[in-house]
């Protein structure tokens, strides 16, 4: 009736950012919908044809988890359920919660055309996604790459940054010694480069050490070897005192101070040399190395971190699989007793066909309320890496790409 009476007037359209269809609305959802309804009604009372377009986000892990919980209660194995059946259950589950949400929104007094809502799981929406993906494939913006991505070892899938919440966690840290193997500097011979890491499990994936040429380093001789097995070590001069305190070493002396540039051409042995890690570890210059914490030398595991990956890629150092889908070490880890993770994924390039430039232009043409929203979105787009669009899951829009089983090429 409102639409009929408002026909011909200037339109104001609020296209809703969709809630997720997997449970009852909460206080945040209610606040969101009430505020939007107030805006819609204000413009309607102000003489406009004010339209609210409701919608729901229906794909993804949260709904899969709910269906998996049902299987667990019935003592069923999800992997034994035909994919077609699993997807139907996910679709039915999402549809059920959309209907519940509609009733809950109406109880809040929200006005909208709830008979003609949009949903990401509608066949029309899924078909449009495939069409748009095809455009990226044809203009070569869509490509398969091997990069570190956020990985869930429980669900065995890549994740988006927006799907992750960072929690404070206390982890064990270690210092590790990399014995210098090759160098043209006499004062570096027989010394051990010391690194500090909060992720000891990445040591088997180490392929390089990073230093900063503008940092001053010291060759140090330790008298008390109780906490360090190596007598001659190398760390950043400015961090030496804190390292000695952390390791409870009281007696030591500085043999020589030198600039990071003297590391050029130096390579080390892996700490696990005696159990099969016989590859050389080159020392590489990197500006991301700083004096905020650690030793001033960074251990690089290219399959577990974006900075490490990019540095090794730049220096033609290959990554290798050391952790599988479940977060367990693979057979690539030699004779070792038993997470960013580098995996082959599909990406949309932000640089190809000026996608980043187009996105920034669109942001600048948009009015934001409040204006801080623009700053936040702009910073995300300006600095974001290529967009990982693939997931190792069932409930989503499949990538319509065929892979040759023999060559593994698309």
Tell where the protein language model's regions lie, with residue ranges.
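Histidine-rich, glycine-flanked metal-binding segment
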Residues: 1-10, 248
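N-terminal catalytic cores of NTP/NDP-binding nucleotidyl/phosphoryl-transfer enzymes
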Residues: 6-67, 129, 195-202, 282-311, ...
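Protease-associated
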Residues: 208, 215-297, 306, 310
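Short, surface-exposed loop/turn motifs at beta-strand boundaries within globular domains
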Residues: 169-171, 213, 261
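Residue patterns forming the tRNA-binding/recognition surfaces of aminoacyl-tRNA synthetases
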Residues: 1, 68-204, 224, 265-268, ...
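Structural alpha-beta junctions
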Residues: 46-47, 247-250, 316-318
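Short, solvent-exposed amphipathic alpha-helical segments in soluble enzyme
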Residues: 210-212, 316
């Amino acid at each position: 009736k409102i639409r009929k009476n408002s026909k011909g007037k200037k339109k104001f359209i609020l296209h809703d950012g969709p809630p997720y269809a997997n449970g009852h609305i909460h206080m945040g959802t209610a606040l969101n919908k009430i505020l939007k309804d107030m805006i819609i009604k204000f413009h309607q009372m102000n003489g406009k044809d004010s339209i609210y377009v409701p919608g729901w986000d229906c794909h993804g892990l949260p709904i899969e988890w709910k269906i998996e919980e049902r299987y667990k209660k019935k003592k069923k194995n999800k992997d034994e359920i035909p994919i077609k059946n699993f997807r139907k259950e996910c679709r039915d589950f999402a549809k059920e919660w959309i209907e519940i949400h509609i009733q809950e929104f109406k109880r809040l007094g929200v006005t909208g055309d709830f008979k003609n809502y949009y949903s990401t799981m509608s066949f029309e929406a899924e078909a449009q996604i495939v069409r748009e993906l095809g455009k990226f494939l044809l203009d070569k913006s869509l490509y398969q790459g091997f990069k570190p991505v956020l990985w869930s070892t429980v669900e065995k899938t890549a994740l988006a940054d927006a799907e992750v919440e960072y929690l404070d966690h206390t982890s064990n840290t270690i210092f590790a010694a990399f014995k210098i193997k090759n160098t043209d500097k006499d004062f570096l011979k027989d010394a051990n480069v010391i690194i500090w890491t909060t992720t000891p499990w990445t040591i088997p994936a180490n392929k390089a050490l990073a230093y900063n040429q503008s940092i001053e380093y010291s060759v140090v001789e330790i008298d008390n070897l109780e906490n360090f097995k190596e007598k001659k070590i190398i760390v950043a001069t400015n961090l030496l005192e804190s390292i000695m305190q952390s390791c409870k070493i009281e007696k030591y002396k500085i043999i020589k101070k030198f600039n990071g540039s003297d590391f050029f051409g130096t390579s080390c042995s892996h700490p696990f040399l005696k159990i099969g890690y016989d590859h050389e570890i080159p020392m590489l210059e990197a500006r991301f190395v700083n004096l905020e914490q650690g030793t001033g030398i960074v251990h690089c595991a290219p399959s577990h971190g974006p900075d490490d990956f990019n540095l090794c890629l730049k220096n033609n150092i290959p990554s290798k699989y050391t952790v599988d889908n479940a977060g367990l070490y693979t057979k690539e880890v030699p004779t070792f007793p038993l997470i960013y993770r580098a995996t082959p994924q599909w990406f949309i390039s932000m640089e190809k066909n000026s996608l980043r430039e187009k996105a920034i232009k669109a942001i600048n043409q948009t009015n934001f309320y409040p204006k801080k929203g623009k700053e936040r979105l702009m910073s995300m787009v300006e600095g974001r890496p290529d967009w990982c669009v693939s997931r190792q899951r069932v409930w989503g829009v499949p990538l319509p790409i065929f892979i040759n089983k023999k060559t593994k090429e698309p």
